[in-house]
C-alpha cells in the first residue's frame, strides 16, 4: 500500500526530492553535495526481504542519455571492488538489473549530472533481528556487515582510482561547458508578471542547484512581439 517507502512527515520519499528540492531533506542533500562536490557518491538502502545484495550499475538500457559511458565504466570498476569484498564473506549479489540510473532527482544519480560517479547499494531486509530465507538465516548484524564492507570497498576503489576520478570530473565540466557554447540557444528569457509567487519559488530552486539567473538589464522585445520588461523578466 502507498506509501511503500521511507518517507518524511509529509509522506514524501526524500530520496526523490533532489530536483524539486521542496523539503528540508532534499534541500540539505543539495547543500551537502555542493559543499563537497564529491567524486564518488554512494546511496545505501534497504530493499525488500529475500533479495540478494544489489549494487550499481543499473539496467544498461535505463541510464539517463546525458550520463557519459565513461561514468558507467567507472561505476562498474568501483563495483568490482564491492563484488570482491562480498565474495570473501560469501554474500550473494546481483547488478545491472532491477534498478535504473535514469532519474537525476535521487541520491544515486544526481551527481551523475555533475561529474560525480554515483552508486546505489541495496541490502535485503531481515524485517527484524533474524529471518529464515531459502539461502539460510539472515541476521540484522549480517546485513550491517554487508553494507559496511561495501562502503569500505568503495573507499578502497576511490583511493586506487583517485587520479582518474579527478580527471573525469574535470573533463566532464570542461566538455559540458564546451558543448553548451556550441548550442544555438544560449539562454532563455521568462516573464514573471502575474506569477510573482511562482517565479519566486522557481528562482529559489535554481539557486539551490547553483544555476545562475540574471534579471533583465533592459526591456526586450522578442520575435512575435513578445515583450519582456526590465524588473519583471529574467534570463537563464
Model-identified regions with their sequence ranges:
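Detector for the c-type heme attachment site
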Residues: 46
